[in-house]
Every structure is written in C-alpha cells, then in structure tokens.
From Swiss-Prot:
It comes from the Bacteria. Keywords: Ribonucleoprotein, Ribosomal protein, RNA-binding, rRNA-binding, tRNA-binding. One of its GO terms (cellular component) is small ribosomal subunit. HAMAP family: Ribosomal_uS13. The gene is rpsM. InterPro entries: Rbsml_uS13_C, Ribosomal_uS13, Ribosomal_uS13-like_H2TH, Ribosomal_uS13_bac-type, Ribosomal_uS13_CS. Part of the 30S ribosomal subunit. Forms a loose heterodimer with protein S19. Forms two bridges to the 50S subunit in the 70S ribosome. Residues 101-122 have a biased composition (Basic residues). Belongs to the universal ribosomal protein uS13 family. This is Small ribosomal subunit protein uS13. One of its GO terms (biological process) is translation.
C-alpha cells in the first residue's frame, strides 16, 4: 500500500483519485503532480513502482503544504484574525458566515440548528 504524507492511498483506485485522499490535494493538484512526475493518471495505486511513489512523495513534500502543516496554517490564520479583532475575526468568533452572505435567512450551516421561538401567547 502506498503511503504518502502519512495517508494510506486506496489500492484499487486510480492514482489521480487516490491522491485526493490527502488533505490539501484535489483533482487539479493531483493531475499537476502526476504531470510533473510523468506518471500515467490511469495507473492503479497498487501498480505504482516504488520509484514512482518516491517521486510523487518528493514532489508533494517539496512543493505543497498538505495534511497537518496545511491544517495548522489555516488554524493560525483564523486565530490571527480573531486576535486582531478585524471584521472577519469577529465573524469567526461568533460562528457566523465570514464572506458577506446573508444571515436573516439561511446560514444554517454556520449558525447551527435553528432555535425555536415560542409563538404569541393568547
């Protein structure tokens, strides 16, 4: 089983898809990596040679932030925004949408489940 960036890639999938199991690598980056290493995207992960796996691992380690490093950088960016007290930081702290979306209706993903408001008493 190919292990790249601390992630076991699924053996039965194509390399192009298998690389997307690594946090921070989607289809476009996976294709870019395969072009740089000269590996055919249609190859199955189980059919990769050790040399090809090492090439892929080398490119990812050198040129991309993935897994823990990427998660840490994102967390630090959010922490920095909250500490300086800018608008985006306040929105993160309050658990509201950060990028200007409306909140009168919708925004349930960020706000959590709706809190029922009791109707008018008779």
């Amino acid at each position: 089983m190919a292990r790249i960036a601390g992630v076991d890639l699924p053996r039965e999938k194509r390399v192009e898809v298998g690389l997307t199991y690594i946090y921070g690598i989607g289809r476009p980056k996976a294709n870019e990596i395969l072009v740089k290493t000269g590996v055919n995207p249609d190859t199955r992960v189980r059919d990769l040679t050790d040399d090809e796996v090492n090439k892929i691992r080398e490119i990812i380690d050198k040129e991309y932030k993935v897994e823990g490093d990427l998660r840490r950088e994102i967390a630090l960016n959010i922490k920095r925004l909250t500490e300086i007290g800018c608008y985006r930081g306040r929105r993160h702290r309050m658990g509201l949408p950060v990028r200007g979306q409306r909140t009168k209706t919708n925004a349930r993903t960020r706000k959590g489940p709706s809190k029922p408001v009791s109707g008018k008493k008779k």
